[in-house]
């Protein structure tokens, strides 16, 4: 993103310098037995190839796509997020994985192999069918029967409890439904986007910086998750490209409001103490009802910084999306 906007070689070289390590990670199997190949390899290697034609970046991104394909479960038609394949305790998808699908769409376009695309579409359909509740809030994760593939139940991992609204999960739903429509222009994804976005906006506190879970409201003193607002803004700006002008204008206006709030309340304005950009993100917050330990609470996060920058770029440039 920095190189695209400035054309300064220092940013380009710093990014390309990372590509060999991304390939090495796959070859040596360094924490790659999970679904997050798109998050790792789309804004790095796919972006590098699109912008510079770097052949190693292309090769590495295709390796990552193949690694992700290995996690697809035919019984249930979804990508298993975590754990040993087929383990009943981990036979589930998570809403985050919608952002991993563009890696497969890119691989399909790049290789002319439709299997990548077809598999991504199956996962998207399964996800949107099961993680979105009747009130348009979302589950973080959803379990399936490993023997039959039948849907079982929605539960949380990083949210406050199973029935609450994990803020970042809701934001993934916003961006994920926009991406779904980009690659499969079915009106049902626009309708899902509208409803998921409305639910997100209805639960925002006064200063527009989401609490880590929407169970919490103003006065609770609970940590925020600024990254959720940045992700949601990106999703609104993406979907605006496919909507009628008046509706698109409303979502663009809302995205700008979120970004102004992030800039006012969360932008780190000093070069001391941290190399982060966006304060007040939360990776995982423990609760009496979830399974995580406190990790990255009220800190800068890689994805918070990235999606904040992406949203800003979307506002100032005709940007070719990495996703």
Task: Please annotate each region the language model reported.
Residues 1-323:
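Glycan-recognition and catalytic cores of secretory/periplasmic carbohydrate-active enzymes
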């Amino acid at each position: 993103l920095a190189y695209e906007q400035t054309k300064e070689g220092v940013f380009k070289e710093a990014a390309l310098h990372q590509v060999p390590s991304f390939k090495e990670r796959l070859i040596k199997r360094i924490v790659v037995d999970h679904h997050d190949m798109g998050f790792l390899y789309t804004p790095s290697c796919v972006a590098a190839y699109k912008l510079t034609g770097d052949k190693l970046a292309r090769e590495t991104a295709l390796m990552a796509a193949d690694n992700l394909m290995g996690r697809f479960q035919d019984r249930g038609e979804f990508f298993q997020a975590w754990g040993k394949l087929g383990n009943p305790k981990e036979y589930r998808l998570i809403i985050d994985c919608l952002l991993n699908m563009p890696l497969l769409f890119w691989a399909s376009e790049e290789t002319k192999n439709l299997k990548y695309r077809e598999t991504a579409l199956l996962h998207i359909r399964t996800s949107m069918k099961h993680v979105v509740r009747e009130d348009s809030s979302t589950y973080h994760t959803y379990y399936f029967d490993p023997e039959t593939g039948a849907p079982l139940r929605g539960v949380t991992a990083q949210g406050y409890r199973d029935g609450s609204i994990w803020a970042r999960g809701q934001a993934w739903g916003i961006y994920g439904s926009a991406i779904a429509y980009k690659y499969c222009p079915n009106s049902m994804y626009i309708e899902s986007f509208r409803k998921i976005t409305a639910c997100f906006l209805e639960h925002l506190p006064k200063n527009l910086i989401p609490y880590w879970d929407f169970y919490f409201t103003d006065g609770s003193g609970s940590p925020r998750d600024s990254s959720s607002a940045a992700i949601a803004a990106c999703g609104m700006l993406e979907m605006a490209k496919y909507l009628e002008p008046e509706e698109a204008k409303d979502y663009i206006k809302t995205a700008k409001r979120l970004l102004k709030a992030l800039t006012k309340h969360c932008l780190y304005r000093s070069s001391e103490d941290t190399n982060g950009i966006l304060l007040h993100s939360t990776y995982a917050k423990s609760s009496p009802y979830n399974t995580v330990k406190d990790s990255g609470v009220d800190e800068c996060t890689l994805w918070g910084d990235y999606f904040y920058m992406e949203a800003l770029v979307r506002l100032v440039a005709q940007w070719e999306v990495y996703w």
